[in-house]
Amino acid sequence: MIDLAAKPFYLKPEDIEWVNTTLAGMTTEEKAGQLFCVLFKECKPEEFEYVFNILKPGGCMYRVVPTERAIAATQNIYSRSKVPPLIAANLEKGGNGIVTEGTLVGAPMEIAATDDIGMATKMAHACAAEASAVGANWAFAPIIDIDTNYRNPITNTLSLIHI
């Protein structure tokens, strides 16, 4: 048995009780659904209806949508979930990775070009604030990537280090 009071969880007794009660109340299908993270391209109600009637995923990822739609999507997902879901987004360049009104801060290479480590911290705070405002709690984008293939047009601007 996993000790939920120990590292890395450090849960309080009431939180451990919630975990045990929630897990005991889940069907095998609901437990299996927790393994899935579904991509929602447009965050439209019909997408949720289909996915949650069949799969009941433990997480999802939004593509860039207007703020109001992202908030409505988060509320929709939470209302259908027994377990608080993981809601992911690509935030490597800013809050614009989840909502159309989000701030484009810059690629990690641009942040590194400032030669100011504090800029990476400021970027992370801006990304976290904008993403969490619409319910995201999981970033699917590295702040640091290592560019081992200079021909790769994606990782080269997401990288701080070229080797």
Which role fits each region the language model picked out?
Residues 1-56, 162-163:
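Preference for extracellular/luminal or secreted protein segments
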Residues 41-161:
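Enzymes and membrane/adaptor proteins characterized by extended Gly/Ser/Thr/Asp/Glu-rich
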